UniProtKB/Swiss-Prot annotation:
Phenotype upon changing residue 98 to G: In MACA; decreases protein levels; no effect on binding to GDP; decreases by 55% GTPase activity; abolishes interaction with MUT; impairs GTPase activity stimulation by MUT; highly reduces release of AdoCbl by MMAB
Known outcome of mutating residue 290 to A: Abolishes binding to GTP and GTPase activity
Residues engaged in binding GTP: 150-158, 292, 328-330
A GO biological process held by the record: cobalamin metabolic process
Gene Ontology CC entries for this record: cytoplasm; cytosol; mitochondrial matrix; mitochondrion
Disulphides: none
Consequence the record notes for mutating residue 292 to A: Abolishes binding to GTP and GTPase activity
Source species: Homo sapiens
Gene expressing this chain: MMAA
UniProt effect for mutating residue 258 to N: In MACA; highly decreases protein levels
Location of this chain's protein in the cell: Mitochondrion; Cytoplasm
Subunit and partners: Homodimer. Interacts with MMUT (the apoenzyme form); the interaction is GTP dependent.
Alphabetically ordered keywords of this record: Chaperone, Cytoplasm, Disease variant, GTP-binding, Hydrolase, Mitochondrion, Nucleotide-binding, Transit peptide
Regulation: GTPase activity is stimulated by MMUT.
Protein name (database record): Methylmalonic aciduria type A protein, mitochondrial
Length: 418
């Protein structure tokens, strides 16, 4: 029995015990109390509505709290100028305008506090549009997300240019999010990936966006998830994320994509020491690159080695076994076959429901990554912590204080804030 009440009185709630109904479902207006003298378990001021269930049980009235998904208007607090700016970006983006997409990604990459707020408003609008489009597509994903990783010199950019041209010629719209490493000293980045894809960068059905890592580990940027969502909102049906190829720890992209592809050069021994169990376990497809000319024989040997190695690894999917193929971006050998295997992977994962479950899990990982980032930002900007950091750093440098004890002092100062 649904009822909408502003503030139910305590006597009204007690009177429900004498009612013949087994269950009432009430929705209350935003407040820190559910009614007179009935405080919430926590204030839900950020929510537009409260949702509370009162179950009439034999042992009396039992309250169950649950959070409604209806949130307050995300545009609350925006000036007219800011609202027009967000609306302009949103309208242009869903119409597929590349300039608006580029500006939107720049907005979400900004570290300015107000721009970050505007970015969240824009992302919420795009997310709602994205959900509507998926529903009209019978619940199927709008885009196929593919992560590419591999050691330096594996030929990732060369492969993407050949592969991307093939896809656009077949009628697909391709977005490439190329991540470039930032300098540890200056913080700068060359962003040279786009210059290595000259043909693809001129293709009107392809969009290449190089972004700096700015120190983010995992081979991706801080806002890669947001950029993926914006590209899908702009109508791109294949999203390629080329990661920083710097070793076995750089596979955070696997938590953002549908399929993780590992590109390996035809080399062995010390040259592949960084490509070990960790990243191999995450790969859905392994491609041995540069399989042409004098490198065909070593490429075949590496392929056989990894076919054997993959048999020993734990099975990650009930419907898909990782494949190892040889490709050449120079001759085109194996590229079409590789795309066929990628489509097979997508079809099998969709049919089994594993892809849907994987994306839901990725949303949870995305949320916790944002929480960690936000908590760290609040920690660094806390007045007491900011004041104590230089003093404690100096004591750690001269050996008067252990790093662990200094960290404990800062955490206690942060937790004891008013």
């Amino acid at each position: 029995m649904p009822m909408l009440l502003p503030h139910p009185h305590q006597h009204f709630l007690k009177g429900l015990l004498r009612a013949p109904f087994r269950c009432y479902h009430f929705i209350f207006h935003s407040s820190t109390h559910l009614g007179s003298g009935i405080p919430c378990a926590q204030p839900f001021n950020s929510l537009g509505l409260h949702c509370t269930k009162w179950m009439l049980l034999s042992d009396g009235l039992k309250r169950k709290l649950c959070v409604q998904t209806t949130l307050k208007d995300h545009t609350e607090g925006l000036s007219d100028k800011e609202q027009r700016f967000v609306d302009k970006l949103y309208t242009g983006l869903i119409q597929g305008q590349r300039a608006c997409l580029a500006e939107a990604i720049t907005l979400v990459e900004s570290t300015h506090s107000r721009k970050k707020e505007l970015a969240q408003v824009l992302l919420q609008k795009v997310l709602l549009y994205h959900r509507e489009q998926e529903q009209s597509n019978k619940g199927k994903p709008l885009a196929f997300r593919v992560g590419l990783s591999g050691p330096p010199g594996a030929g990732k950019s060369t492969f993407i240019e050949y592969f991307g041209k093939m896809l656009t010629e077949r009628g697909h719209k391709l977005s490439v999010l190329a991540v470039d490493p930032s300098s540890c000293t200056s913080g700068g980045s060359l962003l040279g990936d786009k210059t290595r894809m000259t043909e693809l960068s001129r293709d009107m059905n392809a969009y290449i966006r190089p972004s700096p890592t700015r120190g983010t580990l995992g081979g991706v940027t801080r806002t890669t998830n947001e950029a993926i969502l914006l590209c899908e909102g702009a109508g791109y049906d294949i999203i390629l994320i080329e990661t920083v190829g710097v070793g076995q720890s750089e596979f955070a992209v696997a938590d953002m994509v549908d399929m993780f592809v590992l590109l390996l050069p035809p080399a062995g021994g010390d040259e592949l020491q960084g490509i070990k169990r960790g990243i191999i376990e995450m790969a859905d497809l392994v491609a041995v690159t540069k399989s042409d000319g004098d490198l065909i024989v070593p490429a075949r040997r590496i392929q056989a080695e990894y076919v054997s190695a993959l048999k020993l690894l734990r099975k990650r999917s009930q419907v898909w076994k990782p494949k190892v193929i040889r490709i050449s971006a120079r001759s085109g050998e194996g590229i079409s076959e590789m795309w066929d295997k990628m489509k097979d992977f997508q079809d099998l994962m969709l049919a089994s429901g594993e892809l849907t479950a994987k994306r839901r899990k990725q949303q949870k990982v995305w949320m916790w990554n944002l929480i960690q980032e936000s908590v760290l930002e609040h920690f660094r900007t806390h007045p007491t912590v900011r004041e104590q950091i230089p003093l404690l750093e100096q004591k750690v440098l001269i050996g008067a204080l252990s790093p662990g004890l200094a960290a404990d002092f800062l955490l206690k100062a942060f937790k004891s804030r008013d």
